[in-house]
Amino acid sequence: NEVIGKTWTNHFMAFKNFITSINNNLQHVIEIGCPTNKLLKLFNNYDSWTLLDPNALTYDTENILSINSYFDLSFNISNKYNTIINSHLLEHLYFPNEQLLRFNDLLLDNGDLFISVPNMEYYAKTHSPFLGIHFEHTYYLNVVNIIYLLNKNNFYIKNMLYFENHSIFYHCKKENNMISSIDLVNQYNLSNINS
C-alpha cells in the first residue's frame, strides 16, 4: 500500500537523505510534530535537537529537549533555531498562514525550513477527489498553494523533490526582505458540475 507500511520507512529515510544532501551540519534543530521521533533517530549531525509535539518522547541526553505541546497560536518559545523540520504537519495546522509566520520567527536569519507534505494532488486525481481531505486534513495543499503560503511568510523555496507519489519535500530559506508576488490560478473547471 502506498500510504502505509514500508512506504513510511522509505519516506523518512528519503527525507533524511534530502535534508543531509543540502545541509550536513544542522546545528540547532526544532522538529515540530514528531510523535514517533523517527527522523531524529536517523540523524547524528546536530548540536541540539528540540522535539515539539504533545506526545514527544523524552530522551535522557543533554542535547535533545522534548516539549510536550501543540504548535498552536498560543505556543511561545524564546529560542531561535538554524533548522526547522516537519513531516506531514502542514496539512494538520488550523492556521497555516499564521503558523508559517511563527516558523519564520523561530528561525535565525538565513535559517533552513525542511517540510514534507502529502502529494494531495496525485491522490485527488488518481484515487478520489477528496482523498486526503478529512477532519485531520482540513484544507487542500497542492504545489501552488504551498508556494503561495511559503512566499507570503518570507520563505524562498530552494529545492523541491517528489518522493514517489506519496510526498513532496521542500527546502526553504528564511528571507526577511522577500517581496511575494504570486497569483493563485483556478486550475479546476467546475462549469460542467451541474450538466
Q: Over which residues does each language-model region extend?
A:
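Conserved S-adenosyl-L-methionine
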Residues: F155-N165
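Short, glycine-/aromatic-enriched active-site segment of Class I SAM-dependent methyltransferases
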Residues: I115-Y139, V143-N145
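A short glycine-rich, Lys/Arg-flanked "PGG" loop and its adjoining helix->strand segment in the class I
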Residues: N97-F114
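Active-site micro-motifs of SAM-dependent methyltransferase domains
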Residues: L73, E91, Y122
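Active-site-proximal loop/turn and secondary-structure-junction residues that shape catalytic pockets
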Residues: A56, L89, N119-E121
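Conserved N-terminal segment of class I S-adenosyl-L-methionine
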Residues: N1-T83, S87, L100, I168, ...
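Short catalytic micro-motifs in class I SAM-dependent methyltransferases
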Residues: S87-Y94
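Short conserved AdoMet
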Residues: N24, N44, Y94, L108-D109
